[in-house]
Amino acid sequence: MKRNTSNVDTGGVPAPLNSTPSTRLIQNGYGDSKYETERMEFPFPEDPRYHPRDSVKGAWEKVKEDHHHRVATYNWVDWLAFFIPCVRWLRTYRRSYLLNDIVAGISVGFMVVPQGLSYANLAGLPSVYGLYGAFLPCIVYSLVGSSRQLAVGPVAVTSLLLGTKLKDILPEAAGISNPNIPGSPELDAVQEKYNRLAIQLAFLVACLYTGVGIFRLGFVTNFLSHAVIGGFTSGAAITIGLSQVKYILGISIPRQDRLQDQAKTYVDNMHNMKWQEFIMGTTFLFLLVLFKEVGKRSKRFKWLRPIGPLTVCIIGLCAVYVGNVQNKGIKIIGAIKAGLPAPTVSWWFPMPEISQLFPTAIVVMLVDLLESTSIARALARKNKYELHANQEIVGLGLANFAGAIFNCYTTTGSFSRSAVNNESGAKTGLACFITAWVVGFVLIFLTPVFAHLPYCTLGAIIVSSIVGLLEYEQAIYLWKVNKLDWLVWMASFLGVLFISVEIGLGIAIGLAILIVIYESAFPNTALVGRIPGTTIWRNIKQYPNAQLAPGLLVFRIDAPIYFANIQWIKERLEGFASAHRVWSQEHGVPLEYVILDFSPVTHIDATGLHTLETIVETLAGHGTQVVLANPSQEIIALMRRGGLFDMIGRDYVFITVNEAVTFCSRQMAERGYAVKEDNTSSYPHFGSRRTPGALPAPSSQLDSSPPTSVTESTSGTPAAGTYSSIGGAVPAVAGHTAAGNGGSHSPSAQPGVQLTTTGSQRQQ
């Protein structure tokens, strides 16, 4: 009995990774005891989708097993690390890390203070809310987050989403030009309600984050492709930049979020531009870009990058205190509330606008989650440690919960600040903790100073910060690689620019899902031919030299079969069968066999199975037998339950296309048909949705000579008894014999390869 070392499903649960391989008897796909073979089991990793009927039970058993393991082996420190992840890096903290973490924390603190003030203004909130968002959420994340370099706080895209959507919910807020000083008791009440909506949104986002993390639903971000997010962030970057140009120009205009409206408003109000703010704003913008570029290009001056925003803030404050520019046409922020944030739990409920807030919370959570996890994974990979994805999501949720409790709007990981944190040498979450207390120091002692900061400074900081969000290089790459992905990118980009932020994102996600549905509903199918001189069967569209055999049609389906694509597959198969029938008759041979290559097919649903039965019956009515090649054990089990396996017949299921063709050609030869391969030049064209370019054959021996005798075998040795080959003699076959029992392939054989096999090589 030959030992089979292939991975054949036993229907059981995979062995633990630390288990040793074991040997046992299994049955092949036919269920025949005479084909019972011995195999070596291998401990493969568990896949909860492998047995869907047992997945829920298996997951629950895994939870119980993990719990029992922890109870049996964990000490109090392990339990503390389980609930507070910062204990993991505290247990291995080195003294050499301390200086790096302090430098990184202070550097990011210098960066986040002016950015926080700017982003809060972009969100339509008082400037101090940006500092609140960089304080307590940062502390909480440093304790419960799993990334050691991620810098948490307010970000530009989220601020834009809030400023856009909340003003749709509360239109009265559009009339407030300075959230720090609304200007009247009525506007004060409107601003307070606006602030309350922002806190309620943060609470909903925190709930979504925590739920996604606890129930391990992080896969939902897979529906936001890189094309969707790239186009979204690029469009949002332009929208953000244009919304801040008014501060650099010194123009007082209402906020507009659509490109055409912004352009019209600027053109109509350009005569109101103040040259003082324009000169100061453009000077600050030049300095910020200069500091950033020099810091990125030179390791010697990398310290310039994080201090750029703080530097222009200091220059602006000096101009106010020394030059008294606020009385010369320069607008300043105004009053900023001093001290640490006060609790706002009472603002959570009642929530009458929940029907409008909840969809926005979903969008904000998805965008923030993708942005944060992508940079966290990149940093973990770069610093060679493991990122716990679900713990990361829970950590962000708890950070937002803390923010919602203490007057903060939604926060997430920042690309720019996280990059600076990593470049500054941050080793652990202590750097994030130090950043929070830099912000806390500003809140307690320096808010009166920042109240005199010119608005053009904040505008310049935001414009310089969003330059990195413009992913035009990604659009060029997608155009070269995949036009459909480029279309999704452009839909997201143009939708955000010309319609609105949330609608543009929705259009892009919808288009991406439609493309996935289209690709799934119209999968690639192929007419397969043999490469001359080999036992390799390939798509004749890609390999024009591949040869076909009259009377034998080999059809490959490159996708799972289910209700959405089975009609397309049926039409393609019927078209190929009709064309092949005519072509075979021209060679004096009827279409005897249709061989379905199921190697790419991983799943068949009930509709697909029923339609396959119809196809088998239809072909049988034309005198054509359906043959299966290389179906998986799961597909065979499904066909058994549905009755399709018995309808086809166990004698017509093979482990390879080559074996199926050899068997069918032998049967046809026994019936008196001379089966000889021919090239595809005379084959009738049958169009395909995809027509890839021709590829070179995978063999240097590309001739059309009659094949010579050699057996296809995993060991490279021919079998003692063989089926007849295409175009060759038909030796007598007494029965099925085991593979690999003698002979060897001679390199001096005639050109070409005879397709021979043994019965024992059928589907096991």
From Swiss-Prot:
Alphabetized Pfam families for the sequence: STAS (PF01740), Sulfate_transp (PF00916)
Main location: membrane
Region feature (Disordered): 1-24, 678-764
One GO cellular component term: plasma membrane
GO function terms (MF aspect): sulfate transmembrane transporter activity; symporter activity
Compositionally skewed regions (Low complexity) per UniProt: 704-718
SUPFAM superfamilies, per database record: SpoIIaa-like
Induction details: Up-regulated by sulfur deprivation.
Disruption phenotype: No effect on sulfate uptake, due to the redundancy with SLT1 and SLTR2. Slt1 and sultr2 double mutants, as well as slt2 and sultr2 show a 50% decline in uptake while the slt1, slt2 and sultr2 triple mutant exhibits no increase in sulfate uptake capacity when deprived of sulfur.
NCBIfam families, per database record: sulP
Similarity comment: Belongs to the SLC26A/SulP transporter (TC 2.A.53) family.
UniProt function note: H(+)/sulfate cotransporter with a probable high-affinity for sulfate and a proteasome independent turnover.
Name this protein carries in UniProt: Proton/sulfate cotransporter 2
Species in which this protein is naturally found: Chlamydomonas reinhardtii (Chlamydomonas smithii)
Gene for this chain: SULTR2
